[in-house]
Amino acid sequence: FSSVPVHWHEEMEFIVVKKGRGLVTLDRESRLLEAGQAVIVLPGQLHGIRQYQQERMEYENIIFRLEMLLPKEGDVCGPKFLEPYRDGKLLYPAWIDGSALYHEEMLECIRKMDELSEQRPRGYPLAVKGWLFQFFFLMFSRVEPTLAEEGREKSLDKMKRILRRIEVDYGKPLSIEEMAEFSGFSESHFMKFFKNHMGVPFVSYLNDYRLTLAARALAEGQEDVLTVAMDVG
């Protein structure tokens, strides 16, 4: 792969590197991750993956809704631990890179879930949930959380609106002038805002996004080159 453009979704995600190395972006921070390392992506968090130089990387995504661990009533796990974490009110380290002793224990939880999902023994969803609870127990019990910064959420929400507009209208001409007006910024402020959040200029991101979708469509072989080119603008 060359890249997975920065995007967001409502599900939680673990990105786990299996082989090689690659650059992973989480909100405004990018890190070089290698085999045996991972990152935790919260619902609504901006994230993406890029190739590092000419190196190859194999990774897997574990995507799930945290609500599967939240009972409707009569349980302290949700309101005391999981909900504040999901909503970004309490911040825990997202990078599982071996810098802490408990990282290996957390990666072992991911490996166990991976094995269960491949083998699928009877009742395996129960065990998967059990390992998810163990994963979060390790994190909550070993790390003191920090409070979210004021103003950070508004900035990220605006960036997510911009990305959603690109996802919907990438096949149309999208000018800096139009996107600046959509965002409520001047053109110069929009360009600065976008690059500060994404690490690349708007036009570069839009072109990369279109190329990524075109490559995916061609790989699936459902349409010819001309049709794909017209679809992605």
Annotate each language-model stretch with its function.
Residues 87, 96-150, 157, 161:
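An amphipathic alpha-helical interaction segment
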Residues 6, 151, 155, 168, ...:
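Residue-level marker of regulatory loop/turn positions in helix-turn-helix DNA-binding domains and
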Residues 18, 107-118, 163, 167-170, ...:
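Regular secondary-structure segments
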Residues 23, 69-70, 212:
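Nucleotide phosphate-binding site architecture
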Residues 137-145, 161-213, 219-233:
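Basic/polar phosphate-binding segments, predominantly the helix-turn-helix DNA-binding elements
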Residues 1, 46-115:
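A hydrophobic/aromatic-rich effector-binding and dimerization subdomain
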Residues 1-38, 45, 53, 77-80, ...:
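Generic protein-terminus/edge-of-domain signal
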